[in-house]
A protein has these predicted regions:
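A short alpha-helical cap/connector motif
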Residues: 1-145, 152-173, 177-187
Length: 187
């Protein structure tokens, strides 16, 4: 078991590094390493909290990009389910491909990362279908963690919607809050 765990982590680490290179070479913004470290610590703490009650955790991510954050979070524990929304069809397709590639060695991220394509405002507020016809019922779920990494000028709007989707002990993480002043100007 120990050997399989090490192989799995080595594969994921290697693949995530390839994703980082792709993001840099193609000017795709992904979460910074320091920020990711904090996010992963928060996810690990939530997993520990929920283990006491024998429950998994649900994460909502706005802004999938290439799937880098989703894969990182999902790889922590097999009891993590992620709903992630991406507006760009190009990014959605890249993320889907990345998630399928990393879905090996018993980590099963593909079945625990639910990807949706479309406008987050619509998909967050009503039971509907996304742009590829997949049923979306995010508005009726409760989340342990919401990670907002989408259109920076809309953070306050996203926050106001997402706070109603949190469990009582849930947390919202906003990436790049100081990004070029887009978020601060709204406050």
């Amino acid at each position: 078991m120990e050997e399989r765990y090490i192989r799995r982590n080595d594969y994921i680490t290697k693949y995530l590094k390839e994703m980082e290179v792709f993001a840099k070479n193609n000017n795709v913004p992904i979460v910074r390493k320091q920020t990711l470290s904090v996010i992963l610590d928060l996810v690990k703490n939530k997993v520990k909290e929920k283990e006491k009650n024998k429950k998994g955790i649900r994460i909502l991510e706005l802004g999938t990009a290439i799937g880098y954050s989703s894969i990182n979070m999902a790889s922590i524990d097999n009891n993590i389910v992620i709903d992630t929304i991406e507006k760009s069809k190009k990014m959605y397709d890249i993320a889907k491909n990345n998630i399928e590639k990393v879905d090996i060695c018993e980590i099963d991220v593909k079945n625990r990362i639910n990807m949706y394509l479309g406008d987050a405002f619509k998909l967050l507020q009503e039971t509907t279908e996304d742009e590829i016809g997949k049923k979306v019922d995010i508005c009726n779920n409760k989340y342990d963690i919401v990670f907002i990494d989408a259109n920076k000028s809309k953070y306050l709007d996203y926050f106001n919607i997402c706070k109603n989707l949190l469990n009582d002990d849930g947390i919202i993480i906003l990436d790049n809050v100081l990004f070029l002043g887009y978020v601060l100007r709204r406050l």
